[in-house]
């Protein structure tokens, strides 16, 4: 399905420029910015007075530090324009081990936020710390 966002202000995140224009989206992917008319789309959305920019990516975060489940984090992140996150689960891995990482993977699977889970590099955290779990390279083979 093609959706036309009409008369929105597109923000160029590289230059900071703003341009009032139209955006054509097909199956949730931006396929064009510029002059389009109503016949180009199946659905028309009036974006007058609204800003349009690409989805933002949080390149490093710890979901468990937010005290939210991945689904609840998705709700607040999407409201602020963040559509993707790269999650480092080292905190839950330090406490729960591989089962904590598996929980994060399962809980992030069917939510509207793109969650990319990296392998934690420090479980246990340091040689002076003991939080209850240990991971080896063998544990992380999935």
Each language-model region and where it sits:
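Histidine-rich, glycine-flanked metal-binding segment
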Residues: 1-4, 10-54
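Divalent-metal coordination cores built from histidine and acidic residues
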Residues: 75-142
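Short, surface-exposed linear patches
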Residues: 25-27, 32-34, 46-47, 67, ...
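Short N-terminal helix-initiation segments at or just after the protein's N-terminus
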Residues: 28, 55-64, 90-94, 119-122
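Short loop/turn motifs at secondary-structure junctions and domain boundaries
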Residues: 12-16, 66, 131-135
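Hydrophobic alpha-helical membrane context
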Residues: 19, 70-74, 100
């Amino acid at each position: 399905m093609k959706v036309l966002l009409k008369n929105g202000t597109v923000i160029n995140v590289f230059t900071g420029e703003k341009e009032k224009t139209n955006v054509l989206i097909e199956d949730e992917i931006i396929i064009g910015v510029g002059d389009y008319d109503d016949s180009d789309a199946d659905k028309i959305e009036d974006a007058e007075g609204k800003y349009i920019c690409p989805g933002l990516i949080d390149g490093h975060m710890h979901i468990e530090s937010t005290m939210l489940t991945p689904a609840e984090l998705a709700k607040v992140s999407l409201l602020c324009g963040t559509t993707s996150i790269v999650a480092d689960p080292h905190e839950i891995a330090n406490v729960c081990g591989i089962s904590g990482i598996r929980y994060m993977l399962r809980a992030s699977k069917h939510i509207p936020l793109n969650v990319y889970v990296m392998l934690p590099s420090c479980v246990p955290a340091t040689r002076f710390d003991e939080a209850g779990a240990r991971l080896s390279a063998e544990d992380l083979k999935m």
